[in-house]
Amino acid sequence: MSHEASGLKEDRKKVLKSAFLMASGTLTSRILGLFRDIALGALFDRAVTDAWTAAFRIPNLFRRLFGEGSLAVSFIPVFMQTQSEDPTGDRARNLANAFYSLLLVFLGVLTLLGIVYVEPLFRLILSSDYALDAAKWELTLRMGRIMFGFVFFVCTYAFYMGILNALGSFGLPALAPALLNVSMLVFTFMPPQWFAVHGDGLAWGVLIGGLLQALLLAVALKQRNYLPRLQKTLWTPEVKAVVRGMLPGLIGMGLLQFSTLVNLYFASSLPEGSISYIYWADRLLELPLSLISVSIGAALLPTLSDFANRGLKEKFQETAEESFLMNLFLAWPAALGLYILAEPIIEVLFLRGKFTVQDVQMTAAILRIYAVSLLLVSCSRVLMPLYYSVKNTKVPMVLALVSLAVHVSLAPVLMRQWGLEGLMISGVVAALINAVLLMGLLKKYSPGIRMSVLLRPALKFVLAGAGMVISLQAYELLMAQTGRGLQMLALFVTILLAVVAYFGLAYVLGCEQISRIRRSSQP
């Protein structure tokens, strides 16, 4: 094996290993988050869960925007370039200090404005029908004021995560949000009489959790001697380069995430519970999405940025192709499983306390539609770093604008026919357009991905998925034998059979992803 081929193999392993570390940390956090959501559905009625979900949308938007968006994709390439040009790390530290100082000023002003003007902000993003319920409206405003401080902490966390990712640390930043979920769980179970208003604890749990996850990464950066410090000189050439790349990316990612606000606005005009149904289905969608696509995309960006800086086009292309195929290989069975087992999954997880059978049916209907979008959104999440790594943030921005325009235009039309489900279908159409355009324009703006390389493995994935679908029918057979009392066991056995069927068939069909997953999980 040549030195170049050996190097490429190590680079691929590095990306997959980084993604595996991120996925491991994310899995821990998501499991805790799932317990939190189960408690939320069982302990609080739909008026409180709607209020909390609506109030959390804004700070959560900033979490997604900065934590999975423009801050990392614009900062990491410039940070890595300064490191390569100055091995001492002094320029990289100066960049981190200057940008951090600028970020703190921006976040301080943003948080203060959000707290002061929370009412007009929520009148903008929620329909007028929502405010007709005075008690729910006041609770939403109260929670919004408490949780807006989370924006400051979560954006600080996202910046710290970007530095650690650039330094090759992926596991701890992915694990840190577990502290957020632990905090929210603790506050969810606190006695209601401890708070002035029923539901306040949900908001305080978010705020304290945001502080804890930022502090954890601050300790990690201090140990590496990269903890940013305040400085007077803010507008350095490197900061200018980050901001130039950040603005289009901020708009592009903002437009993609803005679809959640579009859903919130339209859903707030629908019957009570609609906002909560979207939230619970979205949480189940985010589990495979964050474990697979976000982890791969975040791990891919530093590696591709390095290849782009060194002009290694072939390495760039082959690593991108392998990462895209790995995403398809894992997202495809997740989408199939969520679609076919939507209702039993919701029943096992949530059907208790104040979560009713009607809640199960409505949430499951949304989850099935989200399962279709999982493949599309996951592909987009892996394709976008291919643009960002060559410092092109404008194309994803324009494409996000196109898909958002489609969603906003189509949603009211489909809602008249199918209500809440029509709103979700509109989002799927928009996601399809975004993914197709990202793939179609890729070769023009980066080394790209060769379709000929994708077709044969993708066909194998489809065949393995077909076998998995057959194995999923075991759920109905098991339920006929065991009854509702052992539903959780029946669901667990069915999922286990499906996993064995998919990966077993993939192995028989010769899917290389099996061996790559095994190697990446080794220390």
From Swiss-Prot:
GO MF assignments: lipid-linked peptidoglycan transporter activity
Keyword Transport set for record: yes
Transmembrane domains' residue ranges: 98-118, 146-166, 170-190, 201-221, 246-266, 284-304, 328-348, 360-380, 395-415, 422-442, 461-481, 489-509
UniProt-annotated location(s): Cell inner membrane
Topology term for the membrane: Multi-pass membrane protein
Gene Ontology BP annotations: cell wall organization; lipid translocation; peptidoglycan biosynthetic process; regulation of cell shape
Associated pathway: Cell wall biogenesis; peptidoglycan biosynthesis
Cited CDD domains: MATE_MurJ_like (cd13123)
Keywords of this entry: Cell inner membrane, Cell membrane, Cell shape, Cell wall biogenesis/degradation, Membrane, Peptidoglycan synthesis, Transmembrane, Transmembrane helix, Transport
Main location per the UniProt record: membrane
One GO cellular component term noted in the UniProt record for this chain: plasma membrane
InterPro entries: Lipid_II_flippase_MurJ/MviN, MurJ
Family in the record: Belongs to the MurJ/MviN family.
NCBIfam families: murJ_mviN
Chain's role: Involved in peptidoglycan biosynthesis. Transports lipid-linked peptidoglycan precursors from the inner to the outer leaflet of the cytoplasmic membrane.
Protein name, per record: Probable lipid II flippase MurJ
Gene (name only): murJ
